[in-house]
């Protein structure tokens, strides 16, 4: 055993307590946090060592040290495991298990000359309590958001989906600083190929560390050059469980308050759980408004630029006069004017996101109202353009996914440039390029633009609009789930005449 | 080169999409000019000409399907190989490749000219060519699945233009269709012949047939496609005849586009500009299929990598856009494509059909003799 | 990725150097254009254009230019202004009387050739020169006279009082064999522009001036008219028994001698005329006009108490309309203009050779038409 040169994997036991102390001190020589205490009990030397701030000290004292030292028992490893009323007892023999165990909040007990160390779990993880969602705020429906604690998040998900059918696979990624990742899906529903693909991508990930699930998404998505996110990241447990119950796969990560949902389609980014809680006839128009606003957000300002730069013919005369008057004193070409204003909006948004909430609001008012008015009065922008820019900025914020909203907002810039170079033809070129790009994209190997292409008429009802629950007796066909029937279709109501 | 093509299961497509493939190939720039061409031959009886043409197209299509049915999963190049042998087959297939190239070129030039006349008189051919060809490259790189997706999505998205025709449709002068049955039979046939450039495009069936999964739906899907395009051409022509007086129509190059000039909404005064831009969505799918046909045929016949053909062809076409700047030069390219296509698409299948049937019978007899 | 970026860069460099800008505020956007022919066959154009200048709050300017062609005249007018005059937003094209009498097709076809020009612009003629209408009007009103003329015409078209006169309509009817276009005539009344009549064309030449009320008669054959107000004079004779006398407070007729006519104002809620060819050899046509009218006003207190008076009223209106149609046709035949489209009907019925324009011009003065007018009086308002 000693011949194995790799330090962490050698089995050093049995050894004397003092030797162990020396060894541990040398392992932790740059961070002198390790608490290593030695006790004499019934003529046996016992060492208890742990990292104080990783454990809950009073629990260690009450539940472990007191029973251990006040008992008359002759302790051995088996005796400890059998007699101490704690359920997380484990034996470790190798250093590469002991060291991470210490970091993960384990308390180690070593009785001299034993062949292993006994450990108990007393993790004291600092975490914030569950709070309402910040970035994806909802009006109706559950409002809690994920926290940075994986255990809490799993707890929430488990409580949402109370079935043993829920599979939660554990995968550790990151070579230098490993992190726990959980792959969550419904065993009886999720498509096996998709689960395998996801598991394989996670397992084969060969990186030193992953900061957050949003970073994880970038490592494992299909096309990293695309501007569109291919997996949905959400901070809502509600939304995550909804996706899992639909047969999708979720990935949760330790220390990350957002979940990944895969496979995602372009249209699923415009889906909010609120649509479900609303009745179908008010939910569908709301979703339609979101699609509309995406289109408006991409096209409105470029249209203005194209019309004013090249195609004044398409503007109705009355509008032409007001646009012309407001443009009269502006010294820049419309492209630069539009880019300047778009940039200003982006500045406001960025500043608002960085500043504390209260200051952020003030900045919004100062930037929006004061600077806007001043810019128009100073004659460097036209007021009609300000209206268009504001509408398209507002429209881009309607996307329920922050990632998608950002992508759409950024798309405007190349579109404006194209409109400024080639007018309507440029815009159409940009749109064609965009649609071809969307058609080429995949998410976990599944077409991104599904269910539009490849067309699945049964899925349109869920992806683009909603019909009454009675029509939604099928799950997404395009996901090729194991069981695509949600419930048997209720029999059509008997047709009744009036007054029967 | 094998006669039958083996297609991986994930490359298979549903016959449903054949409708969009054929419609997007047929309805391109051709439909813009077709009313004038037919009208100058058959006058107010143009509708008969178009119906005759549509019936003929359907017959050709049925002949093509009959040819394809004689094989398990063959495309035109495999059939050439089978019927004419290695060298002669290659020559025939090369003609097919040339046809794709010329058709691509004519579509490209026509759209560029439409843009120049209606929107940007000063734009250079090169810039427009660059736009369209970069779209083509980007799309073709995605493979047949993406190209079909483009034809499907664009096909659906471009349809809203049809609603803009309601306004001109309400202003039709029905007297323009009268008196009926005045054109002599020869003129009717000439009128039908004039639609040949518009109706071209269903020959893509010869190439995509092996990719189709449910072969039993091919017939209905392709027939519906041809019927739909014929209906579109027919209604565009009828609208133009009703809307314009005879003298006007004979002088309007792209009568269908001018129809859009009268529509206006409170927020958009002129729709012809938007329609010309929107036409890109109609043109790009044809360009993609023609380019795909070109590259795929090169791979089938000469085993050249599709990517190589794509890049080389794109550069050649891009340089080619320089040479035909004038209207009548563009017309010459279109006329050439039309002549070329006419014999190749409308006549050639009837030459091929008896040969294929004969060969099959011979084979059967041989098979029966040997066993 | 780097390759892509380089490609994109090259791309944008090439693109930026291609299409010249036509920014809105750097253009003089022509809104109304007047065309007159002066001596030596030169074209004088009067242009009312919008130009957006930060220093000048007045956005409409008018300039004139002279040239051999209409484009040349525009170029010439361009020397007077620091903005590039561009025709994409012309909404009204006004031709002087003399110009219109010589034919306006050459001017119209230059408009059509330019794809940027709108097809929905209005075509009108003036009874003096276009220049005078536009400049005097502009000075007098101190606003955009072009806009005012447009709204005048558009209002009347909306009421179906005059036929549609957009460029597309005008050209389409002009080019149809067997039909001639009409266009409103703009004149000055108290130095302000007003519609003073309707010009009848023979092909593209102005050949006669019709009364504005006759425009409605023509329009019934061109489209389904709806909601047109109209004043009609009827003979007083048949109504004497039904006129309420205010002085005697009875139905006794008043002094008759000074009044021969009773004037009523009706609103034609629906109207439709159609022409059938009764006899192709005699060129005998029948024109049926069906009108549904509401009574709005009458010059005297007419009481419509029962069916009988309604029937009389209907009959008198029919008679009056028939008389008007006959007058109109006589006038049109005299000037050889066929806006009602008898030739078009004849063409559709004619077998063999296609009808030519000259052939119809010869035949037109000899046609006979029976006008049958059928009037239904629908509502009488709140009083009887």
Regions found by a protein language model. Give the residues of each.
Chain A
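Generic detector of multi-pass transmembrane helix bundles and their immediately adjacent loops
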Residues: 303-306, 316-319, 331-500
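Membrane-interfacial loop-to-transmembrane-helix junctions in polytopic alpha-helical membrane proteins
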Residues: 278, 282-285, 326, 352, ...
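Membrane-embedded alpha-helical signal segments
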Residues: 1-299, 314-317, 438-500
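Short aromatic-rich membrane-water interface segments that cap or initiate transmembrane helices
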Residues: 283, 321-333
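Functional cleft and adjacent loop/helix regions within the main domain
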Residues: 311
